[in-house]
């Protein structure tokens, strides 16, 4: 079975083809970072228009990369939510139209389920059950995963997501959009311990997160300690350490609560090297395992959508006859396979 995956939930146009026997056959990605950089964030209307321009050419490029034609595609999977409504509608409309023209099923995919399943694309995929840390610009969640569609929300951010906090703090430090990766690069040059940021909500029970206060703490620290290059690097280091420690503490609690031995980390922030190293060290001490996707599959991409669509189709998902998107779509509402 070969599935064409279409991802257009935000500011990346991702197209991929996944074969259940041969694996990933094609992966095309276009990023709109330069388009939105002057605005300091994603402009929804510009994002939608750029998806219109790029989606079909990238599908053609993916078919060429795989050496396939439309007749070789058995299903089309597209991101139906959550995300920006205009951007989602582009991918959904193209996906549903192609499926109709090619007479194959059209499978709507939950964007965060795509992220959650992305580590399954690797050579050593995680087995169920596991705790999943979904950590990105729009989401920070801990999920108990016992099977496809068997998701229990354990905790989530009550305000800013971790990735959003990274980007906002990076802007305070004078870094360009998207600032998260640049902040991490700056943090690598910082002095450990010069500044100590709080670890939000770790002094009380529960698995929820709160990161908005770290941005305020960073703003006050910047204002009170000057703006030379080393000070900015030290502040970046303190901020990153606080976020990573907070995520690690909550992951440990989730593992203790569930009794699971496997931790899956997914989403754009899961590419953070410090976070990967800290969680790997923690899981080694606990006698467990941590799993994550390669960096290019941590951020938005078509490969995870193609794979998630294939899994859903194989487990009995019904093809969509209409074009429907859900900008807000709780993961827990997905049906169990």
Curated annotation (Swiss-Prot):
GO terms for cellular component: cytoplasm. SUPFAM superfamilies: Actin-like ATPase domain. The keyword Iron-sulfur does not apply. Its main location: cytoplasm. Substrate binds at residues 134-138, 167, 180, 272. It catalyses: L-threonylcarbamoyladenylate + adenosine(37) in tRNA = N(6)-L-threonylcarbamoyladenosine(37) in tRNA + AMP + H(+). Fe cation binds at residues 111, 115, 300. Its EC number is 2.3.1.234. It holds the Pfam family TsaD. Keywords: Acyltransferase, Cytoplasm, Iron, Metal-binding, Transferase, tRNA processing. It is found in: Cytoplasm. One of its GO terms (molecular function) is N(6)-L-threonylcarbamoyladenine synthase activity. The keyword Ligase does not apply. InterPro entries: ATPase_NBD (IPR043129), Gcp-like_dom (IPR000905), KAE1/TsaD (IPR017861), Peptidase_M22_CS (IPR017860), TsaD (IPR022450). Its cofactor is Fe(2+). One of its GO terms (biological process) is tRNA threonylcarbamoyladenosine modification. Binds 1 Fe(2+) ion per subunit. HAMAP family: TsaD (MF_01445). Required for the formation of a threonylcarbamoyl group on adenosine at position 37 (t(6)A37) in tRNAs that read codons beginning with adenine. Is involved in the transfer of the threonylcarbamoyl moiety of threonylcarbamoyl-AMP (TC-AMP) to the N6 group of A37, together with TsaE and TsaB. TsaD likely plays a direct catalytic role in this reaction. Belongs to the KAE1 / TsaD family. NCBIfam families: gcp_kae1 (TIGR00329), T6A_TsaD_YgjD (TIGR03723). This is tRNA N6-adenosine threonylcarbamoyltransferase. The lineage of its organism: Bacteria, Pseudomonadati, Pseudomonadota, Gammaproteobacteria, Enterobacterales. The gene is tsaD.
